[in-house]
């Protein structure tokens, strides 16, 4: 297998460095907004990657239709982008006219893997999404509030506290993603070693 990160020696790579995870939500004013990106938050500044993430066909998936696929995959420049869309409860006041009755937030989880590792994408995406939904469903709306508070020029004590709470949630989600990736790749390697 080729090293997906050519400047990093393969033997020094951690399992969570094999993939990139993007957690986003749809904001009625700003569009597709990242909540977190791991392992490298600086990808927010990469216009090419963020353009791809924001136009991924997962955003057009109707998840209320039970016959829809569970996920949508996209291949681009040597990587596979596996994506899942789900809804979480929200108490956030919506800013678009006519959206006051919406009590849910649209969340998109995208997992990027090198194309020669795409066999692992579906299972890993499922594990990460199940764990985020199980452990963070009520907290994701707080994370969204924190991200919106960061955008505001004037930071009130309430918005500063919201940002602080959001950062703590974000760090916990990142730890969950890292642990899930490590555990998953270690279990896959053990299974492969046992059958070799």
Question: For the regions a protein language model found, what residue spans apply to each?
Answer:
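Acidic, low-complexity cytosolic segments
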Residues: 2-19, 29-196
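Solvent-exposed interaction surfaces and binding hotspots enriched for charged
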Residues: 24-26
């Amino acid at each position: 297998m080729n090293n997906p990160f050519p400047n990093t020696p393969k033997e020094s790579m951690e399992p969570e460095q094999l993939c990139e995870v993007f957690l986003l939500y749809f904001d009625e004013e700003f569009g597709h907004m990242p909540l977190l990106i791991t392992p490298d938050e600086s990808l927010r500044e990469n216009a090419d990657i963020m353009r791809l993430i924001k136009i991924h066909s997962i955003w057009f998936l109707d998840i209320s239709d039970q016959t829809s696929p569970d996920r949508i995959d996209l291949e681009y420049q040597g990587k596979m982008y596996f994506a899942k869309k789900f809804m979480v409860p929200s108490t956030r006041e919506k800013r678009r006219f006519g959206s006051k009755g919406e009590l849910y937030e649209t969340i998109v989880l995208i997992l990027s893997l090198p194309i020669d590792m795409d066999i692992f994408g579906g299972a890993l995406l499922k594990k990460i999404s199940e764990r985020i939904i199980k452990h963070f469903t009520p907290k994701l709306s707080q994370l969204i509030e924190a991200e919106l508070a960061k955008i505001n020029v004037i930071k009130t004590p309430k918005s500063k506290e919201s940002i602080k709470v959001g950062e703590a949630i974000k760090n916990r989600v990142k730890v969950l993603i890292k642990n899930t990736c490590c555990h998953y790749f270690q279990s896959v390697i053990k299974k492969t070693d046992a059958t070799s």
